[in-house]
Amino acid sequence: MKQLFFFFLVFPFVVWSQSDFEKGEKLFGEAKFKQAQVLFESYLKSNSNHIKTIEYLGDTASHNSSWENAVFYYRKLKDLKPNEANYYYKYGGALGMKATQVNKFRALGMIGEIRGSFEKAIVLNPKHIEARWALVMYYIQLPGIIGGSEAKAIKYSNELLKLSPIDGYLSKGQIFEYFKKYALAEEQYKKAIAAGSTKKGTQLLANLQKNKLKKTSDDSISDFVDNIIKK
């Protein structure tokens, strides 16, 4: 009887202590990220190493573009679970976004850790698709003088092709488009569509064709102005 009494005494507290997390999950699923954040923070106060709560807080910070906070929570995750590939991937992504908000000198100092985080994710999970995508974008967007490389981007794109043909074609299309090799990019997007990426592939192909038309129009205007100047 005493055990039963103890159960009824403790049970409401257990339900209450879990409710902030559960309510936070529900709000997160409804994309109410700021409201979810408040509840997750409340839950974390009494559950300081609760992995899923920390991940949710990193994710809500990311959705709210609060990259400093996202980096904080994802760093805590990878420290708590150093063998979890996805936490390195998320940390690298948040750190990359943070780098866009600081001065160039600070950003330069973060480059190695960003790349290293994505590479670590692949070491821990050799089939990690998102980390390879991140490295493709990393190498094409970074200036060559500080480590950008079309060849390295293609290397990771080729790895994607082996894991997921659609991701391989789409990533290679992105590389070719970035370096203005439009015919090659179009070919890759069409391959992605044929492989089953009807929505994303069609969207990227349409954007490519739109950009090509704009470039042709801009070049025509430029040629027209040049001809006037020459005359």
Predicted stretch roles:
Residues V15-Y56, S62:
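N-terminal leader/linker segments that initiate helical-solenoid repeat arrays
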Residues L27, A61, L95, V102, ...:
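Residue at a conserved register position within TPR or TPR-like alpha-solenoid repeats
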Residues E30, N64, K98, L142, ...:
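Structural motif corresponding to the intra-repeat A-B loop/turn of tetratricopeptide repeats
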Residues S46, L80, L124, L160-L163, ...:
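Structural marker of alpha-solenoid helical repeat scaffolds
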Residues H50, E84, H128, P165-D167, ...:
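Residue-level recognition of tetratricopeptide repeat
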Residues K52, Y56-D59, K90-Y91, A134, ...:
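Canonical tetratricopeptide repeat
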